[in-house]
């Protein structure tokens, strides 16, 4: 499985609107491209999360514009189990690799 995690995603935010019309601000955890699926993916978490809160990560495939920008209308739900498994594997790798997740406490 080939993927590339972008380190430039820190400090990027996206507003999502739920089925009730409520807006929620999300931070970009990271993005990556899967050569196997020929799709790009974005993983988000709520911006209003305290340090000790459990974080629920949202994952979507997306189509960026020609400048590489992404809006909520560019996001697509992941519907296949195989895609979910792949995204979960990438997330697990990200969380286990201190160099990617920015966790310096292991040093």
Curated annotation (Swiss-Prot):
One Pfam entry name: DUF1292
InterPro entries recorded: EF_Hand_1_Ca_BS (IPR018247), UPF0473 (IPR009711)
Annotated family: Belongs to the UPF0473 family.
Protein known as: UPF0473 protein Ldb1604
Biological source species: Lactobacillus delbrueckii subsp. bulgaricus (strain ATCC 11842 / DSM 20081 / BCRC 10696 / JCM 1002 / NBRC 13953 / NCIMB 11778 / NCTC 12712 / WDCM 00102 / Lb 14)
């Amino acid at each position: 499985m080939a993927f590339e995690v972008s380190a430039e995603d820190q400090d990027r935010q996206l507003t999502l609107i739920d089925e009730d019309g409520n807006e929620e601000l999300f931070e970009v955890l990271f993005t990556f491209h899967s050569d196997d699926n020929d799709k790009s993916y974005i993983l988000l978490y709520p911006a209003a999360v305290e340090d000790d809160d459990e974080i629920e990560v949202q994952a979507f495939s997306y189509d960026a514009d020609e400048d590489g920008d992404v809006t909520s209308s560019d996001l697509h739900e992941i519907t296949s189990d195989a895609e979910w498994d792949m995204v979960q594997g990438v997330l697990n790798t990200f969380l286990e690799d201190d160099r990617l997740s920015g966790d310096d406490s292991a040093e």
